[in-house]
């Protein structure tokens, strides 16, 4: 098994992340959309790479004041079941001590992702009805509180 490092998102990761997006999501981000995040001062994106520089996955988060909103967590099919998604979430949270909370939406039927987020300290806080399309599905809204007393 290859050694995985979590590194800042960079221009050389864009095309591989776009490929992962196409493999994982029914409404994937484009390369242009991902490239715009490189210059977005409100974006916190991290990339998981192996020792050969292959992109294994990524996480993207946007911040507004002291709030974080995870846009996507994705792991390439060839790298799944190795704890990479968990490492990405944990590293993002570790780098977010300046935030009061981080929140995300997850398909209500995505039990593995819900278990991952729960294991990383997220708790369900609501539902967004018909949030997803292709297929239409509710989203479970989950939040991790990073500062005491803000629940």
Language-model-detected regions and their locations in the chain:
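Short glycine/proline-centered loop/turn elements that form peptide/ligand docking sites
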Residues: 89, 110-113, 130-135
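Conserved GNAT acetyl-CoA-binding A-motif
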Residues: 96-106
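Structural motif
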Residues: 20, 99, 119-120
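Conserved active-site tyrosine of GNAT-family acetyltransferases
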Residues: 117, 122, 142
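Acetyl-CoA-dependent GNAT
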Residues: 8-80, 86-95, 145-150
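Residue-level recognition of the GNAT/N-acetyltransferase active site
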Residues: 76, 80, 107-109, 134
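Conserved catalytic-core motifs of GNAT/GCN5-like acyltransferases
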Residues: 103-105, 123-140
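Extreme N-terminal starter segment of soluble prokaryotic enzymes
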Residues: 3-6
């Amino acid at each position: 098994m290859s050694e995985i490092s979590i590194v800042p998102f960079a221009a050389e990761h864009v095309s591989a992340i776009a490929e992962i997006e196409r493999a994982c999501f029914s409404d994937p981000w484009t390369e242009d959309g991902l490239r715009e995040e490189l210059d977005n001062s409100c974006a916190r994106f991290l990339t998981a790479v192996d020792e050969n520089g292959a992109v294994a996955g990524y996480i993207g988060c946007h911040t507004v004041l002291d709030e974080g909103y995870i846009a996507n967590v994705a792991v390439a099919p060839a790298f799944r079941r190795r704890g990479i998604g968990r490492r990405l979430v944990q590293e993002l949270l570790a780098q977010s001590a300046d935030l009061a909370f981080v929140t995300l939406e997850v398909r209500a039927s995505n039990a593995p992702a819900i278990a991952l987020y729960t294991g990383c300290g997220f708790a369900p806080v609501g539902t967004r009805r018909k949030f997803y399309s292709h297929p239409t599905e509710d989203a479970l809204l989950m939040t991790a509180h990073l500062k005491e007393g803000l629940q």
